[in-house]
């Protein structure tokens, strides 16, 4: 299992407004567009195809999101991820992002993708905080 965490110098609600809006993709590198239909988001990756992810759980009160890849241009057997935000203080929160993937040979690819997305998420949240 892959696991990342990051403490944001931003209110929990501000970070949730980005990651909890499941069709918002400005923080996901390589994704040009997202279409959300009946709990399934389709991510368009120019030059790579489309990825479909089923939103399994989105808990607005506990700031928790769980999703599973159901269609991918790479031959995945299983991919599920969880994002949890916890309040550290009124103006700080911690994001914990965990993911499982099979076959395990794709783990390094997923780790690189998640690292890039986390870096972009930090940039987006910081830009919104400075508005």
Q: What are these regions, as identified by a protein language model?
A:
Residues 39-46, 71:
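Short aromatic-glycine motifs in intrinsically disordered, low-complexity regions
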Residues 71-124, 128-131:
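Beta-strand/loop substructures that line and gate deep hydrophobic ligand-binding cavities in soluble
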Residues 6, 51-57, 69, 79-87:
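Hydrophobic/aromatic beta-strand elements that line small-molecule binding cavities or substrate pockets
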Residues 12-13, 56-62, 85-94:
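A short, structured loop/turn motif at beta-sheet edges
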Residues 62-70:
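Short, solvent-exposed secondary-structure boundary/capping segments
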Residues 15-19, 25, 41, 55, ...:
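Hydrophobic pocket/interface hotspot
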Residues 1-5, 40, 50, 78-80, ...:
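Intrinsic-disorder/low-complexity, polar/charged segments enriched in Ser/Thr/Lys/Arg/Asp/Glu/Gln
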Residues 1-35:
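Hydrophobic ligand-binding cavity/cleft-lining segments
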